[in-house]
Protein backbone atom coordinates (compact mmCIF):
# COMPACT_ATOMS: atom_id res chain seq x y z
CA UNK A 1 0.00 0.00 0.00
CA UNK A 2 1.35 3.40 -0.94
CA UNK A 3 0.36 6.80 0.38
CA UNK A 4 1.71 8.37 -2.77
CA UNK A 5 -0.94 9.08 -5.38
CA UNK A 6 0.30 9.85 -8.87
CA UNK A 7 -1.15 12.97 -10.45
CA UNK A 8 -4.11 12.08 -12.60
CA UNK A 9 -6.39 14.25 -14.73
CA UNK A 10 -8.87 14.42 -11.83
CA UNK A 11 -6.32 16.42 -9.85
CA UNK A 12 -6.45 19.15 -12.46
CA UNK A 13 -10.20 19.64 -12.13
CA UNK A 14 -11.71 22.42 -14.17
CA UNK A 15 -9.68 21.98 -17.32
CA UNK A 16 -11.94 19.82 -19.48
CA UNK A 17 -14.20 21.31 -22.13
CA UNK A 18 -17.25 19.93 -20.29
CA UNK A 19 -16.16 21.54 -17.05
CA UNK A 20 -15.54 24.87 -18.73
CA UNK A 21 -19.01 24.71 -20.32
CA UNK A 22 -20.51 23.89 -16.91
CA UNK A 23 -18.77 26.93 -15.40
CA UNK A 24 -19.79 29.22 -18.27
CA UNK A 25 -23.43 28.12 -18.04
CA UNK A 26 -23.57 28.65 -14.27
CA UNK A 27 -22.02 32.12 -14.56
CA UNK A 28 -24.40 33.08 -17.39
CA UNK A 29 -27.35 31.73 -15.39
CA UNK A 30 -26.24 33.61 -12.28
CA UNK A 31 -25.98 36.93 -14.10
CA UNK A 32 -29.29 36.54 -15.93
CA UNK A 33 -31.18 35.45 -12.83
CA UNK A 34 -29.65 37.34 -9.91
CA UNK A 35 -28.35 40.49 -11.62
CA UNK A 36 -30.80 40.95 -14.49
CA UNK A 37 -33.60 39.32 -12.45
CA UNK A 38 -34.86 37.81 -15.70
CA UNK A 39 -36.29 34.36 -15.06
CA UNK A 40 -37.18 33.80 -18.75
CA UNK A 41 -33.55 34.37 -19.76
CA UNK A 42 -32.27 32.15 -16.93
CA UNK A 43 -34.77 29.29 -17.41
CA UNK A 44 -32.93 27.55 -20.30
CA UNK A 45 -29.99 26.89 -17.95
CA UNK A 46 -32.14 24.91 -15.49
CA UNK A 47 -32.91 21.22 -15.73
CA UNK A 48 -36.49 19.98 -15.49
CA UNK A 49 -35.91 19.14 -11.84
CA UNK A 50 -34.17 21.71 -9.63
CA UNK A 51 -33.31 20.68 -6.06
CA UNK A 52 -32.90 23.66 -3.73
CA UNK A 53 -31.02 23.33 -0.43
CA UNK A 54 -31.34 26.99 0.59
CA UNK A 55 -33.79 26.87 3.52
CA UNK A 56 -35.33 30.20 2.47
CA UNK A 57 -36.18 29.16 -1.11
CA UNK A 58 -38.72 26.67 -2.40
CA UNK A 59 -37.73 23.55 -4.30
CA UNK A 60 -38.15 23.21 -8.05
CA UNK A 61 -38.10 25.45 -11.10
CA UNK A 62 -41.32 27.19 -10.00
CA UNK A 63 -39.74 27.85 -6.60
CA UNK A 64 -36.76 29.48 -8.29
CA UNK A 65 -39.08 31.63 -10.39
CA UNK A 66 -40.82 32.78 -7.19
CA UNK A 67 -37.43 33.66 -5.72
CA UNK A 68 -36.55 35.84 -8.74
CA UNK A 69 -39.92 37.64 -8.50
CA UNK A 70 -39.26 38.22 -4.78
CA UNK A 71 -35.74 39.50 -5.50
CA UNK A 72 -36.98 41.81 -8.26
CA UNK A 73 -39.71 43.28 -6.04
CA UNK A 74 -37.86 43.52 -2.71
CA UNK A 75 -34.27 44.19 -3.86
CA UNK A 76 -34.41 45.68 -7.37
CA UNK A 77 -30.97 47.29 -6.93
CA UNK A 78 -29.18 44.21 -5.63
CA UNK A 79 -26.06 43.18 -7.52
CA UNK A 80 -24.02 39.99 -7.25
CA UNK A 81 -20.39 40.24 -8.31
CA UNK A 82 -18.70 36.91 -8.89
CA UNK A 83 -15.24 37.22 -7.38
CA UNK A 84 -14.08 33.65 -8.06
CA UNK A 85 -15.47 30.61 -9.89
CA UNK A 86 -14.30 27.02 -9.55
CA UNK A 87 -15.40 23.85 -11.31
CA UNK A 88 -14.89 20.22 -10.41
CA UNK A 89 -16.68 17.84 -12.73
CA UNK A 90 -20.40 18.44 -12.38
CA UNK A 91 -20.06 20.99 -9.55
CA UNK A 92 -19.47 24.72 -9.96
CA UNK A 93 -18.64 26.91 -6.96
CA UNK A 94 -18.97 30.68 -6.94
CA UNK A 95 -17.55 33.14 -4.39
CA UNK A 96 -19.83 36.17 -4.60
CA UNK A 97 -20.10 39.69 -3.18
CA UNK A 98 -23.68 40.99 -2.93
CA UNK A 99 -24.54 44.67 -2.56
CA UNK A 100 -27.68 46.78 -2.86
CA UNK A 101 -29.97 44.78 -0.61
CA UNK A 102 -29.62 46.77 2.60
CA UNK A 103 -27.92 50.15 2.96
CA UNK A 104 -24.32 49.72 4.09
CA UNK A 105 -24.51 45.92 4.13
CA UNK A 106 -22.41 43.72 1.89
CA UNK A 107 -22.88 39.95 1.89
CA UNK A 108 -20.44 37.18 1.09
CA UNK A 109 -21.95 34.09 -0.52
CA UNK A 110 -20.59 30.72 -1.54
CA UNK A 111 -22.94 29.14 -4.09
CA UNK A 112 -22.54 25.52 -5.14
CA UNK A 113 -24.33 24.23 -8.22
CA UNK A 114 -24.58 20.70 -9.62
CA UNK A 115 -25.18 20.30 -13.34
CA UNK A 116 -26.38 17.28 -15.30
CA UNK A 117 -25.00 15.63 -18.44
CA UNK A 118 -26.75 18.24 -20.60
CA UNK A 119 -24.97 21.02 -18.64
CA UNK A 120 -28.25 22.08 -17.01
CA UNK A 121 -28.33 23.23 -13.38
CA UNK A 122 -30.18 20.67 -11.28
CA UNK A 123 -29.14 21.37 -7.68
CA UNK A 124 -28.06 24.33 -5.52
CA UNK A 125 -26.58 24.94 -2.08
CA UNK A 126 -25.42 28.22 -0.55
CA UNK A 127 -23.88 29.72 2.55
CA UNK A 128 -24.18 33.45 3.24
CA UNK A 129 -22.94 35.94 5.78
CA UNK A 130 -22.66 39.67 6.23
CA UNK A 131 -19.21 41.07 5.56
CA UNK A 132 -17.90 42.53 8.83
CA UNK A 133 -16.46 46.05 8.98
CA UNK A 134 -13.32 44.66 10.65
CA UNK A 135 -11.87 41.17 10.84
CA UNK A 136 -9.63 39.66 13.52
CA UNK A 137 -7.00 38.91 10.88
CA UNK A 138 -7.23 42.24 9.12
CA UNK A 139 -7.86 40.38 5.85
CA UNK A 140 -10.90 41.04 3.73
CA UNK A 141 -13.36 38.38 2.63
CA UNK A 142 -12.70 38.90 -1.09
Q: Where do the model's predicted regions map?
A:
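C-terminal and inter-domain tail/linker signature
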Residues: 2, 9-142
